[in-house]
Regions:
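DUTPase catalytic domain/fold
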Residues: 1-80
Length: 80
């Protein structure tokens, strides 16, 4: 399967696997920011992705993010 990724900003970091055998890739924001308690924010990643027809990309919390910092993503589905 081929997934096309296009940088929308020069400082964007293309998703990558942190460790061999990881089930998912790490995503990185292109901006630094602070979150206030209970604040919600859309996080800019700086790239676009083309998911093949019949598939979806899933966005999940990084291991320990919620437990250590109380930060929870609302998950995401990137349709083809």
């Amino acid at each position: 399967m081929e997934i096309k990724i296009k940088k929308l900003r020069d400082d964007a970091i293309i998703p990558s696997y942190a460790n061999k055998g990881d089930a998912g890739m790490d995503l990185y924001t292109v901006e630094s920011f602070d979150l206030e308690p209970m604040e919600r924010k859309t996080i800019p990643l700086g790239f676009a992705v083309e998911i093949p027809t019949g598939y979806a990309g899933l966005i999940w919390d990084k291991s320990g993010l919620s437990h250590k910092y109380g930060i929870k993503t609302f998950g995401g589905v990137i349709d083809s």
